[in-house]
Amino acid sequence: MSEYIVEMKHITKRFPGIVANDDVTIQIKKGEIFALLGENGAGKSTLMSMLFGMYEPDEGEIYIRGEKVKLESPNHATKLNIGMVHQHFKLVSNYTIAENIVMGMEPVKKVLGCIPVVDMKKANQDIRELSEKYGLAVNPTDVISDINVSTQQRVEILKMLYREAEILIFDEPTAVLTPQEI
């Protein structure tokens, strides 16, 4: 087993008229906090988007827990326990906090012994417990359009934790926060 949880080796990504990443190699050990710093347009978000399966590298290889992977989509990345909080949140504004977090992994109960339905009572309870466990205070029944941006960021973080992401990617984590919230 590799000592690295993430390895991106010789990654190159080109877009028409621009090279976003040119022969980039990073290695991250389990439990390590890794920060990628650079000016606007330096390719940081592109590199992290490749790790989350939103883009494929033109050249290079990605290894997760020592195994070479081809991340074909964010769903594939999620199955490998990779989560990402994007600079521009991916939330459904007319859904509740709990609905946004559990979407795609909803707890189900049987009605009349055989009809599966989403168990929102359990979802709300699970999200309340998760938010308390990690000190990310949210009310699971609040609607996204009614909450502020810093709470939306907490929702995105809770979404990763609910999915049991082991590799957490934060793209521009302080961009939407006020100085008091940082």
Question: Can you say where each PLM-predicted feature lies in the sequence?
Answer:
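Glycine-rich phosphate-binding loops of nucleotide-dependent enzymes
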Residues: 2-182
